[in-house]
Amino acid sequence: MKYINVRGCNGSGKTTLLRCLARDPLCRVINVIVPDHKPIPVTYAPDGIAIIGDYTPAAAGATTAGLDRIKTQAAAKAVAELVGRDPDVKAVLFEGVVVSTIYGPWQEWSKANGGMIWAFLDTPLEVCLKRIQERNGGKPIKEDQVADKHRTIARVRDKALADGETVRDIHWETALKDIKAVIENLG
């Protein structure tokens, strides 16, 4: 099992967490080509970690880094599979708020690809709302929509657990330490 899907609602810290894994100056970004999609950047860290999207410090100003910038689930799955076939890659990480709310198709994909770790950030809703507010300069946000996503993702976590999927909870205050432990414990 080498796939790790970091899940959480808007403002939970998904992108920030993966950016922390890509701070090494030796990280490189390679554009990967999959059918019916423009090139998709993948960040390769020297320790065998690949992250779908450009998470390097140079891309920190980008609004969307992960799967949310990929137009279709088919393309997202194709790039993850392609990167996962690289024998030098020990872990493929990906995140996105849209994928965080979807269960069935990703569970099927997980089963077809040797399993996936469902890594859920447990960031409290109030913290998510505060972060979103700060990031968009204090403009009003639709708090009810964020709360709905927060609840939906909690239900997805419960469903994954009930179905016997490999679920890991990532504590929002120790997220980097927690995700590194998940990576370290890959089979």
UniProtKB/Swiss-Prot annotation:
The keyword Kinase applies. The keyword Ubl conjugation does not apply. Disulfide bonds: none annotated. Keywords: Host-virus interaction, Inhibition of host innate immune response by virus, Kinase, Restriction-modification system evasion by virus, Transferase, Viral immunoevasion. This is 5-hmdU DNA kinase. One of its GO terms (molecular function) is kinase activity. Phosphorylates 5-hydroxymethyluracil (5hmdU) into 5-phosphomethyl-2'-deoxyuridine (5-PmdU) on DNA as a step in the pathway leading to thymidine hypermodifications in the viral genome. The phosphate is added internally to the DNA polymer. Also transfers glutamate to 5-pyrophosphoryloxymethyldeoxyuridine (5-PPmdU) to produce 5-Nalpha-glyutamylthymidine (Nalpha-GluT). As a final result of the pathway of hypermodification, 5-aminoethyl-2'-deoxyuridine (5-NedU) substitutes for about 30% of thymidines in the viral DNA. It catalyses: 5-hydroxymethyl-dUMP in DNA + ATP = 5-phosphomethyl-dUMP in DNA + ADP + H(+). Belongs to the thymidylate kinase family. 5-hmdU DNA kinase subfamily. It comes from the Viruses. It comes from Pseudomonas phage M6. One of its GO terms (biological process) is symbiont-mediated suppression of host innate immune response.
